[in-house]
Amino acid sequence: HPAFLDGSHLRKFDIVLANPPYSIKEWNREKFMNDKWGRNFLGTPPQGRADYAFFQHIIASMDRNTGRCAILFPHGVLFRDEEYELRKKLVEIDIVDCVIGLGPNLFFNASMEACIIICKNRKEDSHKGKVIFIDAKGEVSRKNAESYLENTHIQKIISAYENFEDIEYFAKVADINDI
C-alpha cells in the first residue's frame, strides 16, 4: 500500500530522491500485477527482481508537469535479460534523461557497481529523444579501505550532465532509437 496518497490517488511530487532496496527476491508480484494505483504501466517485473516495481512506483509518483527523480539502483537494472521489455518501454516513453554509472565499493558492505538514473516528465527540448550516459566508474577515490567521490569527481559528473554532450571515454549522448 502506498505511503503517500491524495484521496484515492497517488500523491504527486516535484522531486523524488530514492535509494530503494536492491533486487528484493520475495515480494507480492501478484498484487503488483493487479495494482489499483496504476504503478504497473511498464509491466510486472520478475519475481526475483523488484527494482522495476520501485521504479514504476517512483515514476507514477512524479508530478506530470514538474516531476523529476534521481534513483540509486544496482547496475544490473541496465542490462538484466529478464527486465528487457520493461527497459524498452521505459526508453520509449522518453523520461530517462541521464544514467550515471558509479564504481564499486561506494556503499558500506556492497562491492557491486551502482547507477543513478535521472528522469524528467518534461525534458528540455534539446534532451527530447535522447539520454546521456556518464561513465563515472573511474571517478572514485579510495582511502583507508573506503571508496568515495571527491568534490572534483562530483563536479565533473554534474558538468557533463549540464552540458549534455559527448565527452570521449566519459559521456555519450544517445538517441533513444539507438538504445
Predicted regions and their residues:
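A conserved structural/catalytic subdomain of Rossmann-like adenosyl-cofactor enzymes
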Residues: 3-179
